[in-house]
Amino acid sequence: MSKLRFRVVETAFKKKAVEVATPAERPSEYFAKYVFNQEKKFKYIPSKVYNALIDAIDNGAPLDRSIADEVAAGMKNWAIDMGVTHYTHWFAPLTEGTAEKHDAFVEHDGKGGMMEEFTGKLLVQQEPDASSFPNGGIRNTFEARGYSAWDPSSPAFIVDDTLCIPTVFIAYTGEALDYKAPLLKALRAVDKAAVDVCRYFNPEVKKVVAYLGWEQEYFLVDEGLYAARPDLLMTGRTLMGHDSAKNQQLEDHYFGAIPTRVAAFMKDLEIEALKLGIPVKTRHNEVAPNQFELAPIFEECNLANDHNLLIMSLMRKVSRRHGFRVLLHEKPFKGVNGSGKHNNWSLGTDTGILLMGPGKTPEDNLRFVTFVVNTLMAVYHHNGLLKASISSATNAHRLGANEAPPAIISSFLGKQLSQVLDHIENSTKDDLISLSGKQGMKLDIPHIPELLIDNTDRNRTSPFAFTGNRFEFRAVGSEANCASAMIALNSAVADQLVKFKKDVDALIEKGEPKVSAILEIIRGYIKECKAIHFDGNGYSDEWKKEAARRGLDCETSVPVIFDNYLKPETIAMFEATGVMTKKELEARNEVKWETYTKKIQIEARVLGDLAMNHIIPVATQYQTDLINNVYKMQSLFPAEKAAKLSAKNLELIEEIADRTAFIKEHVDAMIEARKVANKIESKREKAIAYHDTIVPALEEIRYHIDKLELIVDNQMWTLPKYRELLFVR
């Protein structure tokens, strides 16, 4: 096995960059080549049907099912013209990946031959086996029916020879079994609530769109080295491995020159992404060795989320063409930065106004402050839920590790915006509003320079930061489905905007002028949600104590954090917005607890196997060599000199004995602890047991394995070391 390690290292060093052919067309010409976008819809669908479809997508008009046959025919004809032979309903079950079942277009023609067919019924709905996906008890195995239903707002696309149709996935009783269905409901809720508030400022607003711009971080590891690390293969992270002498301390990797093999991978990935309509924009080295980032131009939230799921799938596929494996785990390597997926979120109107962007007049800035403060109120009242939306067994390794946002949700605003809110809070209504001749009402809201958009203070320790014209939710994990965070955030903001309008309307009904009523409520909100505003160092122990004093959620146990989904205020919020029912929330938590348990369980099994089958045998073999050396010393030298010359080896022999004994004892104890935990029927209590007993055991065992790595002869060590995994490109 040690020979395998050195062989794969040698092979990796010899690998050259894969040549990637540059398309003859410009990127703008091959962009969305494999997407059934508006241009293709216009070409392949009758104009009347096309107009109805676009109206449904853009304005939420009901889509008559009778037009589905003509849409399906146009979609099929385009796909066949592109060489496609199969189709699939592409959806995102609660596994956090994507799922698909491929069917061919061919059907019997009744004359002994075959024909290509794709009907509206097949476009609109399919019936996969719902019992085979996580469902939290909503579906029994003998009640397997679940449906995937077409989402016309996200265009179909082609991967290889298959037409992929984005869909939602629901139980036959109507409960959502995926991420897309509640995301669409959350986006609809925030659209309606935001439009109602926007009409205080502009009665012409008819639609508000939530935008998402994600920043995907990832590691690349040579596939030979990856294959020689069973822990990476099975869990996505290294369960053992001592720090490399050099890691990221020189700060020479971030924005550094991109390695040649990696640059070829990035080029290949970008070409594939652009052809699938993913507007990739930025690529660069990240902080840790062999860590990189990809970011697109922001898009409508549902489409952006589909594109992120698709890009993660593409990354896995394209990386193999280049002799790499992509690691999307939030913390594949201990001692260097983990990977996140910052979610840049904002709201925009159909009239072209970015609601999180400052305006040019005091009235515009009142609208801006209105939406910012309502967002802060939503984050304040649901800070535990937002934390639960990004929590997982994998992201827990990253959050709060002095490299990523802490596991306490707070919001950074920066100096300028903080001063504006302080001014409003500390001013009276008469101070803020004065009559100004023919111009009517004058607002004393400080000017917010446009420079703010590019010059907002940067605070990397904040999990939810205002960055000029948007909020950046930085706590989202690199492996996560963005929908989880976006469902929670958009639902909470929608619920808060509804409450805001109700509060303002109540004052207006009492005779208060509209602007005065808005300011009165905003001033109260600024005071109420002050606890969520924190511009300091989120890594400090002082902040943890201060956050607790402020009443923010400071829980660190992931299974307990999930309880936030079932708090009465959370259930009330999701039901009020029509996003999810109590039954759906309960089912999702069952899935979350079960998934957490299974991931820790797999890690425990893998670590136990590696400890017993790799680490202890290698350490014992080296120990035997040391013992033989001591015996030979004793046969060659007088006793006193032999003892002196062998003293260090005797210390190593004893240390190896102690550490291997500790590892064996604690692996056995961990197995027994798993047996005890596995008997617990409650999924919540079982997950808590795994968190409280198995997770600490993994760290204790790892500590001694990593110490052995420093002792054992490098030639004997079977597993690729961090210096090889992180610096061989």
Outline where the language-model segments fall:
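Histidine/acidic residue-rich metal-binding segments in metalloenzymes
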Residues: F13-E19, P23-G120, V124-N140
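N-terminal hydrophobic targeting/anchoring segments and the immediately downstream early-domain regions
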Residues: S2-A24, T141-F157, T162
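C-terminal amphipathic alpha-helical interaction region
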Residues: Y525-R729
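Hydrophobic/aromatic-rich, well-ordered segments within soluble, folded domains that form packed cores
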Residues: I80, V84, T88-W90, H307-R321, ...
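Active-site-proximal loop/turn and secondary-structure-junction residues that shape catalytic pockets
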Residues: I67-V71, F91-P93, K121-L122, F169, ...
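Short linear, low-complexity motifs centered on an aromatic residue
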Residues: E96-G113, S131, R229, G236-T238, ...
